Amino acid sequence: MAKKEEHVRKPDWLKIKLNTNENYTGLKKMMRENNLNTVCEEAKCPNIHECWAVRRTATFMILGSVCTRACRFCAVKTGLPTELDLQEPERVADSVALMNLKHAVITAVARDDQKDGGAGVFAETVRAIRRKSPFTTIEVLPSDMGGNYDNLKTLMDTRPDILNHNIETVRRLTPRVRARATYDRSLEFLRRAKEMQPDIPTKSSIMIGLGETKEEIIEVMDDLLANNVDIMAIGQYLQPSKKHLKVQKYYHPDEFAELKEIAMAKGFSHCEAGPLVRSSYHADEQVNEASKKRQAQA
């Protein structure tokens, strides 16, 4: 008789305090009124209440709400996507200006159905924010765009303040975790972005708790640094539903602190590491630190 897979109990340090105030309800109302999507909601981010209610920040998700991929860790809907909304860039920019955001993060579903991977709408969103909210710093978080570097150039030519592309997991687990992406393509994507705009900080994140080893996590650090990535984020994988990959381990906060110490010693300009850390967590602080380091090196 097959042994039943053991359930890993969620520890107390992952319990989240839900802050719901006027900021939270106001942001949610604004998103719905403008027909906008956020990865905060779609990916069930554990920090949504802190970011919306306390920090008043949000990560906009453009190119629709349906992804053409089906990564086994991600809660975003998958299937046949809708037509591109060419008015979306202006609505996002209007919301950024209305919210008076210091830092805006723009991510997107993967659009493998589009020849340009959605790069044109992505780029126009950056340009629209620059026009309507010129003092807002902008972080872009695209998919690998199928490895089409002309599409990446379209985005990098807008000169975002940070280019973020997540490698998500260690090399060994990549085929299981995100079957339609590759570890090496993500590394090349990050390297090419830096080659196109050497002064723009690049960033990548991984989730841990999927069965990786500490040595494999450190290997990811080395691989990112070898491809000139400046900023790294490390967070705990949380299973969005029973259909997704199970959590193999919950890392203690002390283990995250050790990983951050290792990453910083290796040479990252910034590393955010913790159980609830996600790619966009405290992104406004990261762009400031990266800018200071660039100025010091100039």
Swiss-Prot record:
Keyword terms: 4Fe-4S, Cytoplasm, Iron, Iron-sulfur, Metal-binding, S-adenosyl-L-methionine, Transferase
Record's cofactor remark: Binds 2 [4Fe-4S] clusters per subunit. One cluster is coordinated with 3 cysteines and an exchangeable S-adenosyl-L-methionine.
UniProt KW Mitochondrion keyword: no
Chain ranges of the Radical SAM core domain: 53-269
Iron-sulfur recorded as keyword: yes
Signal peptide positions on this chain: none
Enzyme Commission number(s): 2.8.1.8
Reaction(s) the record says it catalyses: [[Fe-S] cluster scaffold protein carrying a second [4Fe-4S](2+) cluster] + N(6)-octanoyl-L-lysyl-[protein] + 2 oxidized [2Fe-2S]-[ferredoxin] + 2 S-adenosyl-L-methionine + 4 H(+) = [[Fe-S] cluster scaffold protein] + N(6)-[(R)-dihydrolipoyl]-L-lysyl-[protein] + 4 Fe(3+) + 2 hydrogen sulfide + 2 5'-deoxyadenosine + 2 L-methionine + 2 reduced [2Fe-2S]-[ferredoxin]
Record: residues binding [4Fe-4S] cluster 1: C40, C45, C51, S280
Family: Belongs to the radical SAM superfamily. Lipoyl synthase family.
HAMAP family, alphabetized: Lipoyl_synth (MF_00206)
Name of the featured protein: Lipoyl synthase
Lineage of the species this protein comes from: Bacteria, Bacillati, Bacillota, Bacilli, Bacillales
Gene expressing this chain: lipA
